[in-house]
Swiss-Prot record:
Membrane topology value: Peripheral membrane protein
Database matches in Pfam families: WD40 (PF00400)
Lineage: Eukaryota, Fungi, Dikarya, Ascomycota, Pezizomycotina
Protein's UniProt name: Mitochondrial division protein 1
Domain of life: Eukaryota
The UniProt record lists the keyword Membrane: yes
A GO CC term assigned to this protein in UniProt: transferase complex
Naturally occurring in which organism (per UniProt): Aspergillus oryzae (strain ATCC 42149 / RIB 40) (Yellow koji mold)
Described function: Involved in mitochondrial fission. Acts as an adapter protein required to form mitochondrial fission complexes. Formation of these complexes is required to promote constriction and fission of the mitochondrial compartment at a late step in mitochondrial division.
Positions in coiled-coil regions: 207-247
Compartments it resides in: Mitochondrion outer membrane
Family from the record: Belongs to the WD repeat MDV1/CAF4 family.
Predominant cellular place of this UniProt entry's protein: mitochondrion
Membrane in keyword set: yes
Gene expressing this chain: mdv1
Cited InterPro entries: G-protein_beta_WD-40_rep, WD40/YVTN_repeat-like_dom_sf, WD40_repeat_CS, WD40_repeat_dom_sf, WD40_rpt
């Protein structure tokens, strides 16, 4: 047996290695010998040429390496090393602490210099541990808690319970650690909230700066547009005066022409008539210069709803009518101080007065540069602001000199001037005060206390149709089978206007009266097409669009009607009578006897207040009651009983 074993070594081992390879790798002794020869030749090549100049220990070291590589154990270790990855090699040679130390020591100085200084008492690693997901821990903890929280019955053996203080301490330490992690997480969340608050504050400051810049741009834009409009008007005036100058200018006549003129007196009379005719001013034309708006203001769109834009001390008495053409455009106000004022909303300044009525103006409307005013003197006047010229005001209607001076001092008006040459004509067919009017295109409809509605042709300046409200209502009841006219609702209030509000569109006319009825008229036939019954008090305001008609009444309610069905679509009420109402695409605003404007959102149905009375101290003086409102494109203007006018975003 021993001899047989001795025979196997080394020739037997070499045969096995020759046949099977080393360690099952497929490498034979031939490969090993070839590798050894290559190492020897390489070492000899490196050391041989410079052997004379190098120390002798280099040669001895290379000889030792060659002898070591020829040993089978060394060869097996070398070939095993060739099959090992670098990661496994590092893991097998280095400990965890050494790996961390080498990783930190290998960082470049630039990265180490850019590490931010943090005053937090928690390290980055603690924050990372605190932000790790703990689902698995919760599951395991829940299972342990469910086992440990079972109720003990009286008959159970308490001695069988494991009393292991080590486990309890371990659980306590674990919970304490989790409490620390919760504290770290809370502080991290608090820091994030502070950072977000700082960012929001910075964004608000940036937004305010941009809003101020936008306001300045719109101011400059308005000034440029005003200058451009003045230049265009001057060019048009020059073009109109040029042909007149050509007609008036006559060539120099010769001596023969003079003798012929002296011989023919009829010709001389004709010449004098023509000369006088040229000096007679031509009647005012109804054609007016269109006021083209080249750009629309957008500043109010970036304010939060309910923000104050401007507040003006417009009048010294209660505002009775108010209207404007577009946001930051031209506003017209009328009050019981017998004045009608024109305002530039862009700067909040009064640009002049419209004088001509003999009493207070109850209703008005502005469309482009045309203004219509209805007064208690039973007249309707039409004004063209594009032809206005300013002059110092001389007097006011029904005011003494002392009262005029006091009123001028109390009113904050920059330019006390009267706008001349803007009056077009007067419509004087009514015999009672004009309480409502509306015009569109060349048609104007006016309602009066004489219980009539009149349709006016603005081109010719004359009345083309008179509608008797009582007679038309009686005729409508007769057609429905009732021979007598009876007002629906309560008896008309003596203090209410008989015609409270009206609006026209082409041949359609909606009119609200003191009997609480809303009548829809057909101007082509002059008949009532439909009557809307629902209000129990005088109708004070109305407005309609393509689908709905909204009405406000002294019965404290606002009703929204479906024009297609003739039925009530929605309704809501306030604590006091509704005196004025307007709506746009998003909201309905109303004046309901309070110091605020009542706002109703169409989309979500919410009610909220807007105006100077919002947030006012109940112990201090409250702002005056809002009596008139006007809303266009989210721009709200309200007039109060003390004469103050405020502009708000809505």
């Amino acid at each position: 047996m021993d001899k047989h074993r001795r025979d196997e070594s080394p020739s037997g081992l070499s045969d096995i290695v020759e046949h099977d390879g080393l360690l099952g790798t497929g490498l034979t002794t031939r490969h090993i010998e070839a590798f050894g020869r290559k190492v020897t030749s390489t070492a000899g090549h490196l050391i041989g040429p410079t052997g004379d100049g190098n120390p002798a220990h280099y040669h001895n070291a290379m000889a030792d390496i060659q002898r070591e590589l020829r040993r089978p154990n060394t060869q097996r270790r070398v070939f095993a090393l060739t099959q090992t990855t670098p990661t496994d090699l590092v893991r097998s040679k280095l400990s965890t602490s050494e790996i961390q130390s080498r990783a930190l020591s290998s960082l470049p100085d630039d990265l180490l210099a850019n590490i931010p200084d943090d005053s937090s008492s928690y390290s980055l690693f603690e924050g990372f541990q605190a932000s790790q997901d703990d689902i698995e821990y919760r599951k395991a903890h829940r299972r342990r808690a469910s086992k440990s929280k079972k109720l003990l019955k009286d008959g159970e053996n308490r001695a069988a319970l494991p009393s292991a203080p080590a486990e309890l301490k371990k659980e306590r330490d674990l919970l304490s650690r989790r409490m620390e992690l919760m504290g770290v997480r809370k502080n991290m969340c608090s820091s994030e909230i502070h950072d977000i608050d700082n960012k929001i504050a910075n964004l608000h400051n940036m937004r305010k700066i941009v809003l101020d810049r936008l306001a300045g741009l719109e101011m400059e834009e308005a000034e440029l547009e005003h200058e451009l409009t003045e230049l265009e008007n001057k060019l048009e005036d020059i073009q109109e005066e040029t042909p007149e100058t050509a007609v008036v200018g006559t060539p120099k006549s010769s001596a023969n022409d003079e003798s012929m003129a002296s011989e023919d007196p009829a010709m001389d009379a004709s010449f004098m008539s023509e000369s006088i005719y040229q000096k007679i001013p031509s009647p005012k034309s109804l054609k007016h210069k269109s006021k083209r708006k080249r750009s629309m203001p957008i500043l109010h769109e970036h304010f939060s709803p309910g923000s104050l834009i401007k507040e003006m001390e417009a009048h010294t008495d209660m505002v009775t009518a108010i209207d404007f053409d577009y946001p930051f455009g031209t506003m017209i106000t009328a009050a019981l101080d017998d004045t009608v004022r024109v305002w530039d909303l862009n700067v909040g300044r009064c640009t002049g007065f419209l004088e001509g009525h003999n009493a207070s103006v109850r209703c008005l409307q502005i469309e482009d540069n045309i203004v219509a005013t209805g007064s208690m003197d039973a007249s309707v006047k039409l004004w063209d602001l594009s032809r206005a010229r300013s002059r110092p005001r001389s007097s006011r209607i029904n005011k003494h000199e002392d009262e005029e001076d006091a009123a001028d001092d109390a009113s904050q008006v920059s330019h006390s001037t009267t706008l001349e040459d803007c009056h077009v004509f007067s419509l004087d067919s009514h015999v009672g005060e004009v309480t409502a009017l509306h015009f569109r295109g060349d048609n104007l409809i006016s309602g009066s206390a004489d219980k009539t509605l009149r349709q006016w042709d603005l081109v010719k300046g004359r009345c083309v149709q008179t509608l008797d409200v009582l007679w038309a209502a009686a005729q409508a009841d007769t057609l429905n089978g009732d021979s007598t006219w009876r007002p629906s609702g309560r008896v008309p209030d003596a203090s209410a206007d008989f015609v409270g509000a009206l609006q026209c569109f082409d041949a359609a006319l909606a009119c609200g009266t003191a009997d609480g009825m809303v009548r829809l008229w057909d101007l082509r036939s002059g008949q009532v097409h439909r009557s809307l019954v629902g209000h129990t008090g005088p109708v004070t305001c109305l407005q309609f669009d393509d689908v709905h008609l909204v009405t406000g009444s002294m019965d404290r309610s606002i009703r929204i009607w479906d024009l297609r069905m003739g039925s009530i679509y929605d309704a809501f009420a306030y604590d006091k009578p509704v005196t004025s109402m307007k709506f746009d695409a998003k909201r309905i605003v109303a004046a309901a006897g309070e110091s605020v404007v009542k706002v109703y959102d169409k989309a979500d149905g919410n009610h909220w207040d807007c105006g100077a009375g919002v947030g006012a101290d109940e112990q201090g003086p409250l702002p005056a009651t809002v009596d008139r409102v006007c809303l266009k494109d989210g721009f709200l203007v309200e007039g109060r009983q003390d004469g103050i006018v405020g502009a708000w975003t809505c």
